[in-house]
UniProtKB/Swiss-Prot annotation:
One of its GO terms (biological process) is cytoplasmic translational termination. Pfam families: RRF. It comes from Helicobacter pylori (strain G27). Residues 127-158 are annotated as: Disordered. The lineage of its organism: Bacteria, Pseudomonadati, Campylobacterota, Epsilonproteobacteria, Campylobacterales. It comes from the Bacteria. Disulfide bonds: none annotated. It is found in: Cytoplasm. PANTHER family: MITOCHONDRIAL RIBOSOME RECYCLING FACTOR PSEUDO 1, RIBOSOME RECYCLING FACTOR. Responsible for the release of ribosomes from messenger RNA at the termination of protein biosynthesis. May increase the efficiency of translation by recycling ribosomes from one round of translation to another. NCBIfam families: frr. Keywords: Cytoplasm, Protein biosynthesis. InterPro entries: Ribosome_recyc_fac, Ribosome_recyc_fac_dom, RRF_sf. This is Ribosome-recycling factor.
Length: 185
C-alpha cells in the first residue's frame, strides 16, 4: 500500500523532470537546436500541423537550420508561419528549402535565456512539491482511517521527503547544466 504511493510519487516526479527537459529543448543555447521550432504550426490544407510533420528540419551548423518541406507548395506557408512565430530570425527561401540563419547570441540574450531556464526549473520544483503534498495527504488519510499507525505514517512521510529531495536535486543539476550551456561563449 505504501510502496504503491512511493512508486506513484516517483513516477509523477520523474514526469516533472522529463517535462523540464522538454521545456529546456525549446531554449536556445550556443548551438541552435531544431527543437526551437517545435511550437511552430503550419497551415496544411486547413489544418494546423507541426512543422516537423510537413518537412524535415535539420541543423547545418551551430547557427543555421534548414527546413526541407515534403511538398514544395508549402514553402510560402512555412515561411509565413516562421515569421509569425517571431523567433528572431527571417526565413531564407531558395525555392527548394528554407534556411534560418540565427545571429550569435549577445551576453544580454544569454542572461535572459538563462533566467528563463531558472524559471522553468522553479516551475518543475513546484510540480514536484505538489506531488509530495498529494502523497503525504494519501498517507495521512491512511493514518486517519486507521490503516497504518502514526509511526508508519511518519516513516512514510520521511520516505516521500527523500524521494522529493532526490527529484529536486536532479532538477537543480539540470538547471545548472542548462545555464552553463547557455552562458558558455
Amino acid at each position: 500500500m505504501l510502496q504503491a504511493i512511493y512508486n506513484e510519487t516517483k513516477d509523477l516526479m520523474q514526469k516533472s523532470i522529463q517535462a523540464l527537459s522538454r521545456d529546456f529543448s525549446t531554449l536556445r543555447s550556443a548551438k541552435v537546436s531544431v527543437n526551437i521550432l517545435d511550437h511552430i504550426k503550419v497551415d496544411y490544407y486547413g489544418t494546423p500541423t507541426a512543422l516537423n510533420q510537413v518537412g524535415s528540419v535539420m541543423s547545418l551548423d551551430a547557427t543555421t537550420l534548414q527546413i526541407s518541406p515534403w511538398e514544395k507548395n508549402l514553402l510560402k506557408e512555412i515561411e509565413r508561419s516562421i515569421q509569425e512565430a517571431n523567433i528572431g530570425v527571417n526565413p531564407n527561401n531558395d525555392g527548394e528549402t528554407i534556411k534560418l540563419f540565427f545571429p550569435p547570441m549577445t551576453t544580454e540574450q544569454r542572461k535572459l535565456i538563462a533566467k528563463d531556464a531558472k524559471a522553468m526549473g522553479e516551475k518543475a520544483k513546484v510540480a514536484v512539491r505538489n506531488t509530495r503534498q498529494d502523497a503525504n495527504n494519501k498517507v495521512k488519510k491512511l493514518e486517519k482511517d486507521k490503516e497504518i499507525s502514526e509511526d508508519e505514517s511518519k516513516k512514510a512521510q520521511e520516505q516521500i521527503q527523500k524521494i522529493t529531495d532526490e527529484a529536486i536535486k536532479k532538477i537543480d543539476e539540470s538547471v545548472k547544466n542548462k545555464e552553463d550551456a547557455i552562458l558558455k561563449v
